[in-house]
């Protein structure tokens, strides 16, 4: 409450399980005026399920958006004046929904009437308001244009570059998978452009492309991670039910095991091929990430997160977010649905230009400016 201004408010969404209606959603509203948080009941999850939405982008289609607005925003809107700043913290299913992107009946977006700011937790509001100039060493590690198919000899050569003997991240034998991950052609160009933007500002940048972006290279950042970590690669997230169809993931039920990132050479492990001795598989789960110390990293950017396998669920998105938070990362920027390589690349270049050219290290302002530019 102390971090809010007069024209600002916080919506902290929550959920609970009812014996009669299953999972239900509610929202705590906090502003500068009220002495205590206001609790508003919203809807049962089965009401959203009944709409027949099977992909996150469908929330914003005309046939569904109005029903979503009635369930999610109509019970809340009386508490916010137009033009005010509304911070919000999602919960469960709501991780899939961007409030500002919901279309209104008149064709405008909800975000054109309010300034929405999405947070990973209410605590993030306090940190954000500090808005200090970042005095960390300007270092960045960029992954993109990765080669997911590699010969065993190439995998061995890349693995030899890193000594991971002190890293306690032991995993069992790889089991069989099925489909493969395709090259993200625009991601290499994206990394080259972002590297150029950062180097113009005298940043120390290391880029991993092609065969170089291995799991070994990622784990080697443990306890010596960069200020910025940019990952333009495939991500995957599965529900426990869907995971049963993927041999690689069978037997796992928690979101931290069913979500992750694919690095160089990852197809071999995903397909269940025998890996050379001393070589890691290139499939980095959220659990693997959570075990690392990435405390030096102020921001992780996942710019191609949904372009891989499976359905982007709230649990899956939350799995990756939680993993990087547990590893000590300050801010996570990630996509909720697929965007073309060209648009993604243009947005990322604009985002980094806005970020490094500002007098203050303000990630959220840079993000908003980049959206307007692209």
Residue ranges of predicted features:
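Catalytic cores of enzymes
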Residues: 1-55, 59-374
């Amino acid at each position: 409450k102390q971090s809010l201004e007069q024209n600002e408010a916080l919506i902290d969404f929550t959920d609970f399980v009812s014996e009669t209606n299953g999972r239900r959603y509610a929202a705590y509203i906090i502003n500068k005026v009220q002495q205590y948080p206001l609790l508003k009941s919203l809807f049962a999850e089965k009401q959203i399920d009944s709409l027949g939405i099977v992909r996150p982008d469908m929330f914003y289609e005309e046939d569904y958006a109005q029903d979503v607005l009635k369930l999610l925003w109509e019970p809340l809107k009386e508490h916010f004046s137009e033009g005010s700043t509304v911070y919000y913290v999602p919960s469960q299913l709501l991780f899939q929904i961007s409030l500002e992107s919901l279309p209104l009946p008149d064709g405008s977006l909800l975000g054109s009437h309010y300034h929405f700011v999405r947070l990973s937790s209410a605590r993030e509001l306090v940190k954000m308001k500090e808005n200090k100039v970042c005095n960390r060493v300007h270092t960045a590690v960029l992954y993109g244009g990765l080669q997911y198919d590699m010969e065993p000899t190439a995998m061995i050569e890349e693995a030899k570059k890193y000594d991971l003997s002190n890293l306690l991240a032991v995993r069992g034998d790889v089991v069989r998978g099925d489909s493969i991950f395709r090259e993200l052609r625009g991601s290499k160009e994206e990394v080259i452009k972002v590297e150029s933007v950062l180097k113009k500002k005298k940043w120390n940048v290391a880029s991993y492309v092609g065969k170089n972006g291995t799991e070994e290279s990622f784990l080697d950042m443990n306890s010596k991670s960069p200020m910025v970590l940019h990952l333009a690669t495939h991500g995957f997230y599965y529900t426990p039910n869907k995971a049963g169809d993927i041999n690689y993931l069978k037997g796992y039920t928690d979101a931290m095991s069913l979500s992750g990132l694919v690095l160089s050479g990852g197809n071999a492990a995903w397909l269940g091929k025998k890996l050379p001795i001393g070589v890691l598989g290139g499939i980095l789960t959220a659990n693997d990430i959570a075990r690392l110390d990435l405390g030096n990293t102020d921001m992780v950017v996942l710019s191609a997160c949904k372009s891989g396998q499976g359905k982007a669920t709230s649990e899956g998105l939350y799995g990756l977010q939680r993993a990087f938070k547990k590893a000590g990362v300050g801010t996570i920027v990630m996509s909720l649905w697929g965007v073309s390589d060209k648009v993604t690349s243009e947005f990322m270049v604009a985002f980094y230009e806005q970020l490094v050219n500002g007098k203050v290290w303000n990630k959220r302002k840079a993000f908003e400016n980049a959206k307007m530019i692209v």
